[in-house]
Amino acid sequence: MNLAWPSALLLLTAWAAQADDADKLRALGGGVFTKGGAVAEISLNRSRITDDQLKLVANFANLTDLSLEQTKIGDAGLANLTGLAKLEWLNLYRTQVGDVGLAHLAKLPRLQHLPIGETRVTDAGMAHIAKLKRLVYLGLRGNKIGDAAMAPLAKLPKLTGLHLGETRLTDKGTIQLTALGQLQKLWLHDTRLTDASVPQLAQLTQLKSLYLHRTRLSVEGVRLLQKSLPKCRIFYRSATVPE
């Protein structure tokens, strides 16, 4: 008996199961993309995927990119993703995910990009986010988070992009942001920031883009900030800083 046959049969069975799961995901309105013969990216944006059906995704061990934007996925669904050890990019924008679900994300060791704006996430969930030490981008736009969320986020050593637009952030919260000296892009538009935040923001010397439109900063305050950050393009009142 050829001992290689059982192994080959197992591989063939696993491949057939993945092919079947991929077909089911496509039937729900998703896109499944391969790289090097293995499924590496799945897009289910605006699809009919449910929490229970997300078990189909869990079978793709080589998955690096998963997008669930504008779906009904909630906390229970994220429990199905904890085995995706290679996942680097997870889009949860406009889903039903809340703080409980973030505890599941803390088990994804390679996660680097996490757009999770306009969800049910609050300040309480940031303690879980703080465990994702490889995060490069975090999008929290439109969530009910404020100054209390900043201390946990300040513990993310590789974060270069942070979206806090349309949140409850105030000048007090920017004090914690100074710990993120590696930030290159920062969205703070549609917040209650005033000129009192200028000294703190001026310490983020690696910034390349800063979005401050529809805040309470004055023209003079923004001009002063621009002088402190000459290499940063500041967007103010839907335009760049006035001359």
Protein language model features and the residues they cover:
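Absolute protein N-terminus
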Residues: 1, 19-20
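Hydrophobic h-region of N-terminal signal peptides that target proteins for export
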Residues: 9-18
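Charged/polar, solvent-exposed surface patches and flexible loops
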Residues: 10, 23, 27, 227
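Bacterial N-terminal signal peptides that target proteins for export
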Residues: 1-7
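N-terminal hydrophobic alpha-helix used for membrane targeting or insertion
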Residues: 7-9, 204
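Concave beta-strand-loop units of leucine-rich repeat
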Residues: 37-223, 228-243
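Short N-terminal segments immediately surrounding and downstream of signal-peptide cleavage
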Residues: 20-36
